[in-house]
């Protein structure tokens, strides 16, 4: 088991203070520190220190010894560490995104390769043939949007802005999935005078409407005053996660992170179709083809964890990763899995022991446990988060 040396991604939407306040990570240049990455992603792999004191990339170390480090089932199925674990610190809204399902990712990736679209081209949608399921676990109060509201809810919220666009009136007449799809595309397609008029109607409604989701629209409009994505809180569930609550983000479901600090776990993929709140390229036909226009009640969005002793397991409907929390005590408990694991100290102090080796993790620190090192004993105070595979 090795302590991970992790990198910070300095995206513009990141908080300049959260990682310092929570975990003491220095920020002398006062840059936005958006994400702390833990894993073996080719873009920015964590590093480990070998027995002879050399620092190497975790990705390279796994590549040399896949079966021992990943476990046979994961090595055969995925051929690499199949997840990326992050601390995400949003000071301002991220773009609304949709992740294609596995089959569409494979088809889209092959199609764009055949068309010769460069990987770094603005119009490139598919960077790899994988899907991108995600779990987000709140460390602070965390504001997000996820999945379409129930149609009756959308109807009542759209009434004050019915005059903003003909597609809104069209949906209000017959609120069904087909017309929601047309409305979604129409709002994203708005240009020039049509867009200015629609946003003026929305902003006028803000003066008379109180509470949610109008307050969320006000927050977003500070950063994206001229973006048609400002209509999205009327269509999507606005979710406020309390610390300790989590939700899973399914493929083909629009979602956005708006504000707060969370742990995020995802499959190793960069496939993103944008759907607003962004200056970047939006491929509207491809987006609409990859969205399920079906309602999901807000009450069904939270993941219900299963408690077993000191472990809290968050059920995940895919094999790419599993996520659990462990309450630590002075008495050692065994933590084991048939795969690699990344253990992250959420709070307190964790002591990990394997035979004669002992590793201490302070808040914000993490360790990599190879499959061949499982199980390890854990003790201390506070909580550990564990990401692994149940294969």
Curated annotation (Swiss-Prot):
Note on how the cofactor is bound: Binds 1 zinc ion per subunit.
Enzyme Commission code: 5.3.1.8
InterPro entries: Man6P_Isoase-1, Mannose-6-P_Isomerase, MPI_cupin_dom, Pmannose_isomerase-type1_CS, PMI_typeI_cat, PMI_typeI_hel, RmlC-like_jellyroll, RmlC_Cupin_sf
Subcellular location: Cytoplasm
SUPFAM superfamilies: RmlC-like cupins
One GO cellular component, as annotated: cytosol
One GO MF term: mannose-6-phosphate isomerase activity
UniProt-annotated binding residues for Zn(2+): 97, 99, 134, 255
BP term (GO), one: carbohydrate metabolic process
Keywords tagged on the record: Cytoplasm, Isomerase, Metal-binding, Zinc
Active site: 274
UniProt enzyme class: isomerase
Cofactor(s) annotated in UniProt: Zn(2+)
PROSITE patterns per the UniProt record, alphabetical: PMI_I_1, PMI_I_2
Entries under CDD domains matching the protein: cupin_PMI_type_I_N
Catalytic reactions on record: D-mannose 6-phosphate = D-fructose 6-phosphate
Functional summary from the UniProt entry: Involved in the conversion of glucose to GDP-L-fucose, which can be converted to L-fucose, a capsular polysaccharide.
Xref: NCBIfam families: manA, PRK15131.1
Family from the record: Belongs to the mannose-6-phosphate isomerase type 1 family.
Protein name in the entry: Mannose-6-phosphate isomerase
């Amino acid at each position: 088991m090795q302590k991970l040396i992790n990198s910070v991604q300095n995206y513009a939407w990141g908080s300049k203070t959260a990682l310092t306040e929570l975990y003491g990570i220095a920020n002398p240049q006062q840059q936005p520190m958006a994400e702390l990455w833990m894993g073996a992603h080719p873009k920015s792999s964590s590093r480990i220190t070998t027995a002879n004191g050399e620092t190497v990339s975790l990705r390279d170390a796994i590549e040399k010894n896949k079966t021992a480090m990943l476990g046979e089932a994961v090595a055969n199925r995925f051929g690499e560490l199949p997840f990326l674990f992050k601390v995400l610190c949003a000071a301002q809204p991220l773009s609304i995104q949709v992740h294609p399902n596995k089959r569409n990712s494979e088809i889209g990736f092959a199609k764009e390769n055949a068309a010769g679209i460069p990987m770094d081209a603005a119009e490139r949608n598919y960077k790899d043939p994988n899907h991108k399921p995600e779990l987000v676990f709140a460390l602070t109060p965390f504001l997000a949007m996820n999945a379409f509201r129930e149609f009756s809810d959308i109807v009542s919220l759209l009434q004050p802005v019915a005059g903003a666009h003909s597609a809104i009136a069209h949906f209000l007449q017959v609120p069904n999935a087909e017309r929601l799809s047309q409305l979604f595309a129409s709002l994203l397609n708005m240009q020039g005078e049509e867009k200015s008029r629609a946003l003026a109607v929305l902003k006028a409604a803000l003066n008379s409407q109180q509470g949610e989701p109008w307050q969320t629209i006000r927050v977003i409009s500070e950063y994206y005053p001229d973006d048609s994505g400002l209509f999205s809180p009327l269509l999507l569930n606005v979710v406020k996660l309390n610390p300790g609550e989590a939700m899973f983000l399914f493929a083909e479901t629009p979602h956005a992170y708006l504000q707060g600090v969370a742990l995020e776990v995802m499959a190793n993929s960069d496939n993103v179709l944008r759907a607003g709140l962004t200056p970047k390229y939006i491929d509207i036909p491809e987006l609409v083809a990859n969205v399920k226009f079906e309602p999901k009640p807000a009450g069904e969005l939270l993941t219900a964890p299963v408690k077993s002793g000191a472990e809290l397991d968050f059920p995940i409907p895919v094999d790419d990763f599993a996520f659990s929390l462990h309450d630590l005590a002075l008495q050692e408990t065994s933590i084991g899995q048939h795969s690699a694991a990344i253990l992250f100290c959420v709070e307190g102090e964790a002591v990990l022991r394997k035979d004669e080796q002992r590793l201490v993790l302070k808040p914000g620190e993490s360790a990599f446990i190879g499959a061949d090192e499982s199980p390890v004993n854990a003790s201390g105070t506070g909580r550990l988060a564990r990401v692994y595979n149940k294969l």
